[in-house]
Amino acid sequence: MLTRLFKEPSLLPDMQKFGGWVDDSGSEDSKTKDEEQERCRLGDEDLDEGSVKGGGSRAQSEIAGEEDYDEDVDEDDCGEEGDGDRPKKRGPKKRKMTPARLERSKVRRQKANARERTRMHDLNSALDNLLKVVPCYSKTQKLSKIETLRLAKNYIWALSEILRNGKRPDVVSYVQTLCKGLSQPTTNLVAGCLQLNSRNFLTEQCQEGVRFHTPTPSFSIQSYPYQCSRLSSTNCQSGSSTHSLRNHSLCSAYEALYTEGTSPEYISADFEGHHGPPVCVNGNFGVRQEEPLSPDAERGYQYSMHYTNLHGSRSSAAHGITCGPPGARSGSVHSENLPLFHDVHMHHDRTPAYEELNAFFHS
Protein backbone atom coordinates (compact mmCIF):
# COMPACT_ATOMS: atom_id res chain seq x y z
CA MET A 1 0.00 0.00 0.00
CA LEU A 2 1.38 3.27 -1.00
CA THR A 3 1.45 6.16 1.45
CA ARG A 4 1.63 9.84 0.80
CA LEU A 5 4.12 12.11 2.40
CA PHE A 6 3.07 15.44 3.91
CA LYS A 7 5.80 17.10 2.01
CA GLU A 8 3.89 16.72 -1.19
CA PRO A 9 2.76 20.05 -2.59
CA SER A 10 -0.82 18.87 -3.11
CA LEU A 11 -1.41 18.68 0.68
CA LEU A 12 0.25 21.91 1.74
CA PRO A 13 -2.57 24.32 0.80
CA ASP A 14 -4.97 22.45 3.13
CA MET A 15 -2.59 22.74 6.05
CA GLN A 16 -2.23 26.42 5.46
CA LYS A 17 -6.00 26.80 5.57
CA PHE A 18 -6.20 25.06 8.96
CA GLY A 19 -3.57 27.34 10.38
CA GLY A 20 -5.53 30.38 9.24
CA TRP A 21 -8.60 29.16 11.06
CA VAL A 22 -6.68 28.82 14.33
CA ASP A 23 -5.37 32.36 14.04
CA ASP A 24 -8.82 33.74 13.30
CA SER A 25 -10.40 32.00 16.35
CA GLY A 26 -7.71 33.33 18.67
CA SER A 27 -8.20 36.88 17.48
CA GLU A 28 -11.99 36.62 17.95
CA ASP A 29 -11.63 35.38 21.55
CA SER A 30 -9.38 38.25 22.43
CA LYS A 31 -11.83 40.72 20.93
CA THR A 32 -14.78 39.42 22.98
CA LYS A 33 -12.74 39.55 26.18
CA ASP A 34 -11.79 43.15 25.54
CA GLU A 35 -15.41 44.12 24.91
CA GLU A 36 -16.56 42.53 28.16
CA GLN A 37 -13.92 44.35 30.15
CA GLU A 38 -14.96 47.67 28.64
CA ARG A 39 -18.61 47.06 29.50
CA CYS A 40 -17.76 46.23 33.12
CA ARG A 41 -15.80 49.44 33.42
CA LEU A 42 -18.67 51.48 32.02
CA GLY A 43 -21.15 49.82 34.41
CA ASP A 44 -18.96 50.57 37.41
CA GLU A 45 -18.68 54.21 36.37
CA ASP A 46 -22.48 54.49 36.00
CA LEU A 47 -23.06 52.96 39.42
CA ASP A 48 -20.63 55.39 40.98
CA GLU A 49 -22.41 58.34 39.38
CA GLY A 50 -25.86 57.07 40.52
CA SER A 51 -24.68 56.62 44.08
CA VAL A 52 -23.41 60.17 44.13
CA LYS A 53 -26.73 61.51 42.79
CA GLY A 54 -28.85 59.33 45.16
CA GLY A 55 -28.56 61.56 48.18
CA GLY A 56 -26.35 61.92 51.16
CA SER A 57 -28.65 60.32 53.74
CA ARG A 58 -29.04 57.07 51.82
CA ALA A 59 -25.33 56.84 51.21
CA GLN A 60 -24.59 57.53 54.83
CA SER A 61 -27.04 54.84 55.99
CA GLU A 62 -25.54 52.31 53.60
CA ILE A 63 -22.05 53.19 54.72
CA ALA A 64 -23.08 52.94 58.37
CA GLY A 65 -24.70 49.56 57.74
CA GLU A 66 -21.59 48.30 55.99
CA GLU A 67 -19.41 49.52 58.83
CA ASP A 68 -21.64 47.77 61.40
CA TYR A 69 -21.57 44.60 59.38
CA ASP A 70 -17.78 44.82 59.04
CA GLU A 71 -17.43 45.32 62.78
CA ASP A 72 -19.64 42.30 63.48
CA VAL A 73 -17.67 40.22 61.04
CA ASP A 74 -14.39 41.33 62.60
CA GLU A 75 -15.65 40.48 66.08
CA ASP A 76 -16.85 37.08 64.92
CA ASP A 77 -13.54 36.43 63.23
CA CYS A 78 -11.68 37.39 66.37
CA GLY A 79 -13.89 35.14 68.45
CA GLU A 80 -13.44 32.24 66.07
CA GLU A 81 -9.68 32.72 66.06
CA GLY A 82 -9.71 32.76 69.85
CA ASP A 83 -11.80 29.60 70.05
CA GLY A 84 -9.44 27.75 67.84
CA ASP A 85 -10.94 24.45 66.69
CA ARG A 86 -14.63 25.54 66.74
CA PRO A 87 -16.36 25.25 63.34
CA LYS A 88 -17.56 28.39 61.67
CA LYS A 89 -21.28 29.18 61.86
CA ARG A 90 -23.01 29.51 58.55
CA GLY A 91 -26.03 31.62 57.72
CA PRO A 92 -26.92 35.24 58.31
CA LYS A 93 -25.13 36.98 61.10
CA LYS A 94 -27.29 38.16 63.99
CA ARG A 95 -26.85 41.83 64.50
CA LYS A 96 -25.86 43.08 67.85
CA MET A 97 -28.62 44.94 69.74
CA THR A 98 -27.41 48.46 70.23
CA PRO A 99 -29.27 51.12 72.25
CA ALA A 100 -30.28 52.91 69.05
CA ARG A 101 -31.75 49.73 67.61
CA LEU A 102 -33.68 49.05 70.84
CA GLU A 103 -35.10 52.55 70.74
CA ARG A 104 -36.26 52.11 67.14
CA SER A 105 -38.03 48.81 67.90
CA LYS A 106 -39.74 50.37 70.90
CA VAL A 107 -41.04 53.24 68.78
CA ARG A 108 -42.35 50.81 66.14
CA ARG A 109 -44.18 48.79 68.81
CA GLN A 110 -45.78 51.90 70.29
CA LYS A 111 -47.01 53.00 66.86
CA ALA A 112 -48.56 49.57 66.20
CA ASN A 113 -50.33 49.62 69.57
CA ALA A 114 -51.71 53.07 68.87
CA ARG A 115 -53.04 51.95 65.49
CA GLU A 116 -54.76 48.91 67.04
CA ARG A 117 -56.23 51.01 69.85
CA THR A 118 -57.64 53.49 67.38
CA ARG A 119 -59.14 50.70 65.30
CA MET A 120 -60.89 49.17 68.33
CA HIS A 121 -62.25 52.56 69.40
CA ASP A 122 -63.71 53.08 65.95
CA LEU A 123 -65.26 49.61 65.99
CA ASN A 124 -66.83 50.11 69.42
CA SER A 125 -68.28 53.47 68.45
CA ALA A 126 -69.76 51.95 65.29
CA LEU A 127 -71.34 49.13 67.32
CA ASP A 128 -72.79 51.65 69.78
CA ASN A 129 -74.36 53.54 66.90
CA LEU A 130 -75.74 50.26 65.57
CA LEU A 131 -77.30 49.41 68.94
CA LYS A 132 -79.21 52.69 68.84
CA VAL A 133 -80.87 51.60 65.59
CA VAL A 134 -81.76 47.95 66.23
CA PRO A 135 -84.79 47.21 68.47
CA CYS A 136 -82.82 46.27 71.55
CA TYR A 137 -81.90 48.83 74.18
CA SER A 138 -80.95 48.30 77.79
CA LYS A 139 -79.28 50.60 80.29
CA THR A 140 -77.95 47.76 82.42
CA GLN A 141 -77.05 45.07 79.90
CA LYS A 142 -74.77 45.54 76.92
CA LEU A 143 -74.72 43.10 74.05
CA SER A 144 -71.55 41.50 72.84
CA LYS A 145 -70.13 42.29 69.43
CA ILE A 146 -71.26 39.05 67.82
CA GLU A 147 -74.78 39.35 69.30
CA THR A 148 -75.06 42.92 68.03
CA LEU A 149 -74.03 41.90 64.53
CA ARG A 150 -76.44 38.93 64.51
CA LEU A 151 -79.32 41.11 65.69
CA ALA A 152 -78.53 43.72 63.04
CA LYS A 153 -78.48 41.03 60.35
CA ASN A 154 -81.86 39.66 61.51
CA TYR A 155 -83.30 43.19 61.67
CA ILE A 156 -82.21 43.92 58.11
CA TRP A 157 -83.70 40.62 56.98
CA ALA A 158 -87.03 41.35 58.73
CA LEU A 159 -87.25 44.82 57.18
CA SER A 160 -86.50 43.42 53.74
CA GLU A 161 -89.28 40.84 54.17
CA ILE A 162 -91.72 43.61 55.16
CA LEU A 163 -90.82 45.60 52.05
CA ARG A 164 -91.09 42.52 49.87
CA ASN A 165 -94.51 41.44 51.16
CA GLY A 166 -95.90 44.94 51.47
CA LYS A 167 -97.92 44.24 54.62
CA ARG A 168 -97.46 44.55 58.34
CA PRO A 169 -96.25 41.28 59.91
CA ASP A 170 -97.49 39.56 63.01
CA VAL A 171 -95.69 40.56 66.20
CA VAL A 172 -94.80 36.99 67.14
CA SER A 173 -93.40 36.10 63.72
CA TYR A 174 -91.53 39.41 63.65
CA VAL A 175 -89.88 38.66 67.00
CA GLN A 176 -89.07 35.14 65.88
CA THR A 177 -87.30 36.53 62.84
CA LEU A 178 -85.36 39.01 64.97
CA CYS A 179 -84.30 36.44 67.57
CA LYS A 180 -83.17 33.73 65.18
CA GLY A 181 -79.78 32.46 66.36
CA LEU A 182 -79.61 34.76 69.40
CA SER A 183 -79.08 33.79 73.02
CA GLN A 184 -81.84 33.73 75.61
CA PRO A 185 -80.88 37.04 77.35
CA THR A 186 -80.85 38.84 74.01
CA THR A 187 -84.21 37.29 73.12
CA ASN A 188 -85.66 38.57 76.39
CA LEU A 189 -84.34 42.07 75.67
CA VAL A 190 -85.84 42.12 72.18
CA ALA A 191 -89.20 40.85 73.45
CA GLY A 192 -89.19 43.50 76.18
CA CYS A 193 -88.44 46.29 73.72
CA LEU A 194 -91.37 45.17 71.57
CA GLN A 195 -93.62 44.92 74.66
CA LEU A 196 -94.07 41.18 74.24
CA ASN A 197 -93.91 38.82 77.19
CA SER A 198 -91.18 36.25 76.75
CA ARG A 199 -93.39 33.52 78.22
CA ASN A 200 -96.11 34.20 75.69
CA PHE A 201 -93.47 34.28 73.00
CA LEU A 202 -92.20 30.86 74.00
CA THR A 203 -95.75 29.52 74.22
CA GLU A 204 -96.48 30.79 70.73
CA GLN A 205 -93.33 29.14 69.48
CA CYS A 206 -94.48 25.79 70.86
CA GLN A 207 -98.03 25.82 69.55
CA GLU A 208 -97.59 22.51 67.77
CA GLY A 209 -97.11 20.71 71.05
CA VAL A 210 -93.38 20.27 70.90
CA ARG A 211 -92.82 21.50 74.46
CA PHE A 212 -96.16 21.36 76.21
CA HIS A 213 -98.27 18.21 76.09
CA THR A 214 -101.65 18.07 77.84
CA PRO A 215 -102.88 14.63 78.85
CA THR A 216 -106.26 13.52 77.54
CA PRO A 217 -108.97 12.82 80.11
CA SER A 218 -109.42 9.21 79.05
CA PHE A 219 -106.95 6.53 78.13
CA SER A 220 -107.49 3.36 76.18
CA ILE A 221 -105.87 0.08 77.04
CA GLN A 222 -104.64 -2.24 74.34
CA SER A 223 -105.45 -5.85 75.01
CA TYR A 224 -103.20 -8.73 74.15
CA PRO A 225 -104.18 -12.41 74.33
CA TYR A 226 -101.76 -14.46 76.41
CA GLN A 227 -101.60 -18.16 77.19
CA CYS A 228 -101.79 -19.02 80.87
CA SER A 229 -99.53 -22.06 80.99
CA ARG A 230 -99.72 -22.70 84.74
CA LEU A 231 -103.48 -22.71 84.87
CA SER A 232 -105.85 -25.21 83.34
CA SER A 233 -107.42 -22.45 81.19
CA THR A 234 -105.65 -22.02 77.85
CA ASN A 235 -107.14 -18.83 76.45
CA CYS A 236 -107.37 -15.45 78.09
CA GLN A 237 -110.11 -13.03 77.25
CA SER A 238 -109.11 -9.88 75.49
CA GLY A 239 -110.88 -6.57 75.26
CA SER A 240 -110.35 -2.85 75.05
CA SER A 241 -112.23 0.00 76.60
CA THR A 242 -111.91 3.61 77.62
CA HIS A 243 -110.87 3.99 81.24
CA SER A 244 -110.48 6.81 83.69
CA LEU A 245 -107.39 7.34 85.82
CA ARG A 246 -107.91 4.16 87.88
CA ASN A 247 -109.50 1.04 86.52
CA HIS A 248 -110.13 -2.42 87.94
CA SER A 249 -111.29 -5.37 85.86
CA LEU A 250 -112.12 -8.95 86.73
CA CYS A 251 -112.26 -12.03 84.60
CA SER A 252 -115.70 -13.43 83.84
CA ALA A 253 -114.91 -16.85 85.28
CA TYR A 254 -113.78 -15.19 88.51
CA GLU A 255 -117.06 -13.26 88.64
CA ALA A 256 -118.95 -16.54 88.40
CA LEU A 257 -117.76 -17.38 91.92
CA TYR A 258 -119.99 -14.62 93.23
CA THR A 259 -123.54 -15.40 92.19
CA GLU A 260 -125.47 -12.48 93.64
CA GLY A 261 -123.18 -9.74 92.40
CA THR A 262 -121.41 -9.39 95.75
CA SER A 263 -117.93 -9.27 94.31
CA PRO A 264 -114.96 -8.03 96.31
CA GLU A 265 -115.11 -4.29 96.68
CA TYR A 266 -112.33 -1.73 96.60
CA ILE A 267 -113.51 1.82 97.09
CA SER A 268 -111.10 4.64 96.38
CA ALA A 269 -112.00 8.16 97.38
CA ASP A 270 -109.37 9.63 95.06
CA PHE A 271 -110.29 8.21 91.69
CA GLU A 272 -113.61 6.75 90.70
CA GLY A 273 -115.14 6.18 87.31
CA HIS A 274 -116.79 3.86 84.87
CA HIS A 275 -115.10 0.53 84.23
CA GLY A 276 -115.19 -1.57 81.12
CA PRO A 277 -115.33 -5.29 80.40
CA PRO A 278 -112.69 -7.72 81.68
CA VAL A 279 -109.27 -7.51 80.09
CA CYS A 280 -106.27 -9.85 80.18
CA VAL A 281 -102.79 -8.32 80.11
CA ASN A 282 -99.59 -10.22 81.04
CA GLY A 283 -101.50 -12.84 83.04
CA ASN A 284 -102.17 -10.58 86.06
CA PHE A 285 -105.48 -10.32 87.83
CA GLY A 286 -107.40 -7.17 88.64
CA VAL A 287 -110.46 -6.41 90.74
CA ARG A 288 -113.56 -4.71 89.33
CA GLN A 289 -115.35 -1.91 91.10
CA GLU A 290 -119.11 -2.09 91.40
CA GLU A 291 -121.79 -0.42 93.46
CA PRO A 292 -121.64 -1.42 97.15
CA LEU A 293 -124.53 -3.52 98.32
CA SER A 294 -123.77 -3.87 102.02
CA PRO A 295 -122.61 -1.54 104.79
CA ASP A 296 -119.43 -3.57 105.18
CA ALA A 297 -118.62 -3.10 101.57
CA GLU A 298 -118.91 0.69 101.84
CA ARG A 299 -115.86 0.83 104.08
CA GLY A 300 -112.66 1.57 102.27
CA TYR A 301 -109.94 -0.97 102.93
CA GLN A 302 -106.49 -0.12 101.81
CA TYR A 303 -104.68 -3.42 101.84
CA SER A 304 -107.38 -6.07 102.18
CA MET A 305 -110.88 -6.83 100.99
CA HIS A 306 -113.90 -8.48 102.58
CA TYR A 307 -115.66 -11.27 100.79
CA THR A 308 -119.37 -11.50 101.61
CA ASN A 309 -122.22 -13.79 100.57
CA LEU A 310 -119.96 -16.25 98.88
CA HIS A 311 -122.01 -19.14 97.43
CA GLY A 312 -121.08 -22.36 95.75
CA SER A 313 -117.77 -24.10 95.63
CA ARG A 314 -114.72 -22.69 93.97
CA SER A 315 -113.56 -26.00 92.64
CA SER A 316 -116.11 -26.03 89.82
CA ALA A 317 -115.23 -22.59 88.51
CA ALA A 318 -111.57 -22.22 89.38
CA HIS A 319 -110.46 -24.27 86.41
CA GLY A 320 -112.13 -21.79 84.05
CA ILE A 321 -110.47 -18.69 85.48
CA THR A 322 -109.01 -16.37 82.88
CA CYS A 323 -106.51 -13.64 83.35
CA GLY A 324 -107.12 -9.91 83.69
CA PRO A 325 -104.94 -6.84 84.39
CA PRO A 326 -104.47 -5.56 87.92
CA GLY A 327 -106.08 -2.16 87.40
CA ALA A 328 -105.07 -0.32 84.30
CA ARG A 329 -102.30 2.16 85.01
CA SER A 330 -102.73 5.46 83.21
CA GLY A 331 -100.14 8.24 82.96
CA SER A 332 -98.20 8.58 86.20
CA VAL A 333 -100.90 7.24 88.55
CA HIS A 334 -99.41 4.86 91.13
CA SER A 335 -101.00 1.63 92.19
CA GLU A 336 -99.63 1.16 95.69
CA ASN A 337 -103.16 0.97 97.08
CA LEU A 338 -104.21 -1.82 94.75
CA PRO A 339 -104.46 -5.15 96.61
CA LEU A 340 -102.83 -8.14 95.02
CA PHE A 341 -104.89 -11.24 94.54
CA HIS A 342 -102.75 -13.44 96.77
CA ASP A 343 -103.06 -10.91 99.65
CA VAL A 344 -106.83 -11.32 99.93
CA HIS A 345 -107.92 -12.59 103.34
CA MET A 346 -110.49 -15.36 103.13
CA HIS A 347 -112.52 -16.63 106.08
CA HIS A 348 -113.13 -20.03 104.48
CA ASP A 349 -110.99 -23.07 103.93
CA ARG A 350 -108.90 -23.02 100.82
CA THR A 351 -109.63 -25.68 98.25
CA PRO A 352 -106.92 -27.42 96.21
CA ALA A 353 -107.89 -25.38 93.15
CA TYR A 354 -107.41 -22.14 95.10
CA GLU A 355 -104.06 -23.39 96.38
CA GLU A 356 -103.00 -24.03 92.80
CA LEU A 357 -104.06 -20.52 91.80
CA ASN A 358 -102.29 -18.97 94.81
CA ALA A 359 -99.11 -20.90 94.05
CA PHE A 360 -99.11 -19.37 90.55
CA PHE A 361 -98.86 -15.86 91.96
CA HIS A 362 -96.38 -16.73 94.73
CA SER A 363 -93.93 -18.33 92.31
Swiss-Prot record:
Residues 64-83 have a biased composition (Acidic residues). InterPro entries: bHLH_dom, bHLH_transcription_factors, HLH_DNA-bd_sf, NeuroD_DUF, TF_bHLH_NeuroD. Pfam families: HLH, Neuro_bHLH. In adult, expressed strongly in brain and more weakly in skin, muscle, eye and ovary. Efficient DNA binding requires dimerization with another bHLH protein. PANTHER family: BASIC HELIX-LOOP-HELIX PROTEIN NEUROGENIN-RELATED, NEUROGENIC DIFFERENTIATION FACTOR 2. This is Neurogenic differentiation factor 2. It comes from Danio rerio.
